[in-house]
Amino acid sequence: MNLNSIPAFDDNYIWVLNDEAGRCLIVDPGDAEPVLNAIAANNWQPEAIFLTHHHHDHVGGVKELVEKFPQIVVYGPQETQDKGTTQVVKDGETAFVLGHEFSVIATPGHTLGHICYFSKPYLFCGDTLFSGGCGRLFEGTASQMYQSLKKLSVLPDDTLVCCAHEYTLSNMKFALSILPHDLSINDYYRKVKELRAKNQITLPVILKNERQINVFLRTEDIDLINVINEETLLQQPEERFAWLRSKKDRF
């Protein structure tokens, strides 16, 4: 399987997995044009689309792609049923695509119906987990997002985190504002800064590394607890997550 990223809009990535025969899976096609261009350039045959949630920058290209390739099966959560989804999937179910079994993981927070798809090593996590950050809480609660991230953080170490936006640099600036002396965060920030200066993608990232540099996955880390305790005493990791998310919203 080959993993490909297609830039869209200002900072979106549309992910495409293809096999040696050229069959492909498209994830969150917010815009059809760059996908159609990539399909033509690579002679791919689209078999399926995965949708993680209902926001337009993730579903906007579905209609045109299905018109062009009517055999495509469109998988998505209930909230995408009016966005072109033909096969509604929910937590604990599986989608069989390109000969691989993808587990569906419910991850409410960014939206109430947000889902992720996992087939080792690929995690298509939409706007739930970003490198160095997590999605804004447009519909769900901090508690829901905390639990969703916990689900993802226990996936295998070598999981490739394929999120939908190039937010890594701004996320790492925030991480440095919280833990300015953390060696892992500083090293990763420098690496990301160099990549973005060359207009290069920072994704996918390896989950094992993400656990070290993403403050939203470190709510039980003593260094982070000490920082938060300087401002307020919060006993539960869930409360610390909410504190971080609120800080990031104002950053």
UniProtKB/Swiss-Prot annotation:
Cofactor descriptive note: Binds 2 Zn(2+) ions per subunit.
InterPro entries linked: Clx_II_MBL, Glyoxalase_II_hydrolase, HAGH_C, Hydroxyacylglutathione_Hdrlase, Metallo-B-lactamas, RibonucZ/Hydroxyglut_hydro
Annotated Zn(2+) 1 binding sites: H53, H55, H110, D127
EC code(s) of this entry: 3.1.2.6
Binding site for Zn(2+) 2: D57, H58, D127, H165
Cofactor: Zn(2+)
Domain of life where this protein originates: Bacteria
Transmembrane feature ranges: none
Keywords recorded for this protein, A-Z: Hydrolase, Metal-binding, Zinc
PANTHER family per the UniProt record, alphabetical: HYDROXYACYLGLUTATHIONE HYDROLASE, HYDROXYACYLGLUTATHIONE HYDROLASE GLOB
Function in brief: Thiolesterase that catalyzes the hydrolysis of S-D-lactoyl-glutathione to form glutathione and D-lactic acid.
Family statement: Belongs to the metallo-beta-lactamase superfamily. Glyoxalase II family.
Protein name: Hydroxyacylglutathione hydrolase
Taxonomic lineage from the root: Bacteria, Pseudomonadati, Pseudomonadota, Gammaproteobacteria, Enterobacterales
